[in-house]
Amino acid sequence: MAVQQNRKTPSKRGMRRSHDALSGPALSVEPQTGETHRRHHVSPDGYYRGRKVMQGRED
């Protein structure tokens, strides 16, 4: 088994973990309705890139 040679300091541990943070989902505003939705996903009322592509919850 691999065993560390020397103990890592809290500072080095923090430096290693500095890139582990998760970012939130990218959001867009639908130009037709002004509704917020995830990028590259159909908005809840059925619009995608300014066009009605499916029945939404309003219909």
From Swiss-Prot:
A single Gene Ontology MF term assigned here is: structural constituent of ribosome
Query: What Pfam families does this protein map onto?
Result: Ribosomal_L32p
In which domain of life is the source organism classified?
Answer: Bacteria
Q: SUPFAM superfamilies given for it?
A: Zn-binding ribosomal proteins (SSF57829)
Region (Disordered) spans which residues? 1-59
Report which residue ranges the record marks as coiled coil: none
Protein name, as recorded: Large ribosomal subunit protein bL32
Which species is this record about?
Alkalilimnicola ehrlichii (strain ATCC BAA-1101 / DSM 17681 / MLHE-1)
Report which gene this protein is encoded by. rpmF
